[in-house]
């Protein structure tokens, strides 16, 4: 099933503003300030971070359940870093941090499953061109 999102931008880059929607329930506003100056509103990198955290959590849960150790919960944060490279804004790193509640599993097995989820989740694969993608995984 295709996933859909849309955005509209009005005005010049530094003074304009935009709106976005993703599916039926996610929408917001964004601007130059929200993206580059910590101003109010959302930005594309936050949407990437949320998508990556969600996809990774689902992949980790599926992998653990497939190995016979279903999860009680997985909580994941993703931090997407945007820097200027060759004078162009570039996503230079993504840091995933996940904490799982998984009965009957040891830390090493959880970390191995998390690494497999990082490598295999569709969003990770779509973001394969990001120079640095790190993972910190632990059990609660």
Where are these regions (language model features)?
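Extended beta-strand/beta-hairpin segments
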Residues: 1-50, 54-140
């Amino acid at each position: 099933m295709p996933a859909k999102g849309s955005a509209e931008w009005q005005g010049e880059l530094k003074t304009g503003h935009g709106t976005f929607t993703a599916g039926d329930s996610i929408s917001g506003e964004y601007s130059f300030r929200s993206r580059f100056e910590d101003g109010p509103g959302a930005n594309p990198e936050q949407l990437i971070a949320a998508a990556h955290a969600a996809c990774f959590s689902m992949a980790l849960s599926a992998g653990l359940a497939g190995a016979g150790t279903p999860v009680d919960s997985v909580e994941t944060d993703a931090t997407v870093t945007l820097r200027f490279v060759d004078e162009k804004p570039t996503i230079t790193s993504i840091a995933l941090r996940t904490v799982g509640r998984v009965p009957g599993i040891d830390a090493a097995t959880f970390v191995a499953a998390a690494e497999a989820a990082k490598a295999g989740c569709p969003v990770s694969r779509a973001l394969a061109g990001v120079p640095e993608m790190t993972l910190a995984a632990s059990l609660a």
